[in-house]
């Protein structure tokens, strides 16, 4: 679609250095939620121009791209001016004129494969079940409330097909039981992973992205979780 194409064109300007293209895609009052950058279109253009002059070229490799209403959500591997590969989720909101007006993101350093040999970005990419977009959104909203926010942890098994859970988190192996074991191990060290507020739940077909706020080991944390849903159960997970 046009929105998807525009979002992918925008992130590609980090590699191409095409500041004119970036300018044409962005609303003048572009709202930036990445805390490392200034807000507004000019700040974005400044970043593109800065990267264009860097001695090492920036690379942008999009892995997954989805659309939900006026928002596009992407999973992408960036390497900004040779600083090292980062895995990112980007969310872009479009205004009524079709310009990109707002952006949220979360990035993590690219890590070695996890205990099950999976990376932060490999696994299923096929988009399907477009007729189940809202059903799957509700499933993830309920899961975030019941399980991640801890209101009804006893319901956890209802969200999974037995122990089947393909896991791309850098520190956890496949299986629902492995997630439980990892959280127990953290708790023994006095480390809690707490989800307090869910800000956005974006959905297209069998993929749903939850954007949440909480704490990890007492530090304020943004949690971006991408889940793949299969037959009404959570089947696969990527996160930053």
Each language-model region and where it sits:
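C-terminal and inter-domain tail/linker signature
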Residues: 1-240
């Amino acid at each position: 679609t046009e929105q998807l194409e525009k979002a992918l064109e925008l992130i590609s300007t980090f590699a191409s250095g095409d500041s004119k293209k970036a300018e044409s895609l962005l609303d003048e009052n572009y709202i930036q939620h990445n805390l490392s950058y200034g807000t507004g279109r000019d700040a974005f253009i400044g970043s593109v121009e800065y990267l264009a002059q860097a001695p090492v070229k920036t690379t942008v490799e999009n892995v997954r791209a989805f659309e939900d209403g006026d928002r596009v959500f992407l999973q992408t591997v960036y390497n900004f001016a040779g600083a090292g590969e980062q895995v990112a989720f980007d969310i872009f909101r479009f205004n009524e004129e079709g310009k990109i007006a707002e952006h949220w993101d979360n990035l993590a350093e690219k890590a070695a494969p996890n205990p099950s040999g999976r990376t932060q970005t490999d696994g299923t990419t096929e988009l399907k079940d477009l007729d189940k977009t809202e059903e799957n959104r509700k499933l993830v909203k309920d899961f975030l409330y019941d399980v991640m926010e801890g209101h009804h942890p006893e319901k956890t098994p209802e969200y999974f097909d037995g122990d089947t859970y393909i896991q791309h988190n850098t520190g956890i192996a496949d299986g629902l039981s492995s997630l439980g074991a990892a959280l127990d191990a953290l708790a023994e060290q006095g480390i809690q992973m707490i989800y307090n507020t869910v800000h956005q739940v974006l959905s297209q077909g069998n993929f749903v992205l939850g954007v949440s706020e909480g704490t990890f080991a007492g530090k304020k944390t943004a949690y971006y979780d991408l889940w793949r849903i299969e037959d009404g159960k959570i089947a696969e997970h990527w996160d930053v």
